[in-house]
Design a protein with these regions (language model features):
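Ligand-binding clamshell of periplasmic/extracellular solute-binding protein-like
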Residues: 22-30, 64-74
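Short, charge-rich binding segments
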Residues: 56-59, 81-85, 157-160
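Short, glycine/charge-rich beta-strand/loop segments that flank catalytic centers
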Residues: 67-81, 173-175
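Active-site loop segments of alpha/beta catalytic cores
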Residues: 1-42, 52, 117-377
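Catalytic domains of carbohydrate-active enzymes, especially glycoside hydrolases
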Residues: 50-68, 215-221
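A contiguous, low-structure linker/loop signature
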Residues: 74-138, 163-164
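Loop-to-helix transition at the N-terminal end of transmembrane alpha-helices
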Residues: 46-48
């Protein structure tokens, strides 16, 4: 059985030979393993990024590859030509900010002047991009999408791995775009003060993301992850989730599934109070399900509540188990997760959220051995 077949069976609630294993990796963790690669090259260059993902899959013997960035510019060296290399970092200078790159984390944007966010009333929806041309990665960090070269990275990966491994794409929730547009505090206040305008903005981004996801489905991928890290209890109530997240992510999921691909939601932190709401979206699967103390999900309870409605991808604690744990404690925790997760199928072993930058690679290498020994059906 190929790795791809294994993942497809798990996502479809059929029984593979064993539990598949496939983790999302933080950019920092990737770069920690790719010692000789410039973090700037890894971020901006499609071929460097693709080759890095392929190498890391081989290093950890994962059954699939998640492609979290797409739309690289072929002429990125000309666009980002103001570049400084220092002993411990690289800096790319842009018009309004500089991006500081290290091999330990995401690029860090440092604005020359204090960043000022528009108020909800100042937003003219007609001026927002009709076509999604950026990914709001984190805290003012955008990854620009070349609209003439949106999906080259998928072709580069598929040319080298073929149908052997499951390739997954990624898009970002409309809720993230709203938060990025207005700033976190301003956006959360706007949900209360001007909910209808927020919904208009959310629908605008939903239209663009649905189109982007639908186009992505034409590539050689099996699933698309919808990154929605701010939709947990740490940010919004279940009531606001139902009003400002669920209707919009549901549309994107519908667009993906209409193309014959799987869709799964990635929401960090505490989601125990909204598991049933999340599956109302029609999602094929849920990723993360962070255990305490990072979140509040008990895997056995989640399996009972979710039943055969969605597959689960999770839920190893990347910090307390993989980063701070000993190899012995990692083994104990992961065996327990495999035992619970594999019950009735529909399970992919993964970290709850991404592999933290400083997690020892030896701990990640244990995962393949553990599913081989304890994850057999």
């Amino acid at each position: 059985m190929t790795s791809r077949e294994r993942v497809l069976l798990a996502m479809n609630f059929e029984y593979p030979d064993r539990v598949p294993v496939m983790c999302q990796m933080s950019i920092g963790h990737m770069l920690q393993q790719l010692k000789d690669i410039s973090p700037v090259e890894f971020w901006f260059d499609a071929e460097t990024f693709a080759n890095g993902l392929i190498y890391l899959r081989e290093l950890y013997q994962f059954d699939g590859i998640l492609v979290s960035l797409h739309g690289h510019f072929k002429n990125w060296r000309e666009i980002y030509n103001q570049r400084e290399v220092q002993s411990d970092k690289e800096i790319v200078y842009l018009n309004d900010r500089k991006l500081i790159f290290t091999n330990e984390d995401l690029p860090f944007p440092e604005f020359y002047d204090e960043r000022k966010y528009p108020s909800i009333d100042e937003i003219d929806i007609s001026t927002l991009p009709a076509e999604i041309d950026y990914i709001p990665v984190s805290g003012g960090l955008h990854f620009k999408i070349d609209l003439n070269n949106k999906f080259e990275v998928f072709d580069l990966i598929y040319q080298k791995v073929g149908d052997e491994f499951s390739i997954h794409g990624e898009v970002t929730s409309p809720f993230d775009y709203l938060l990025d547009l207005l700033g976190y505090e301003n956006a959360l206040m706007s949900l209360i003060e001007n909910p209808e305008k927020c919904k208009q903005i959310l629908q605008h981004f939903t239209n663009g993301i649905s189109t982007l996801a639908s186009e992505m489905c034409d590539k050689q991928i099996d699933a698309i992850k919808i990154s929605s890290p701010f939709a947990g209890a740490g940010f919004i109530s279940p009531e606001f989730y139902k009003e400002f997240v669920l209707p919009y992510e549901s549309q994107i999921i519908s667009a993906i599934k209409s193309k014959g691909k799987f869709a799964y939601l990635h929401t960090c932190g505490a989601i125990n109070d909204r598991l049933e709401l999340m599956i109302e979206s029609g999602t094929s699967g849920l990723e993360c399900l962070d255990p305490r103390p990072l979140g509040d999900v008990d895997l056995a309870d989640a399996k009972r509540r979710l039943g055969f409605k969605v597959f689960i991808k999770g839920n190893i604690d990347s910090v307390n188990t993989l980063l701070f744990g000993s190899p012995k404690s990692v083994i104990v925790d992961v065996i327990d997760i495999i035992s619970i997760g594999k019950t009735n199928g529909g399970f992919i072993l993964s970290t709850a959220c991404s592999i933290a930058p400083k997690v020892p690679s030896e701990n990640i290498k244990l995962l393949k051995d553990l599913v081989e020994k304890f994850g057999r059906y």
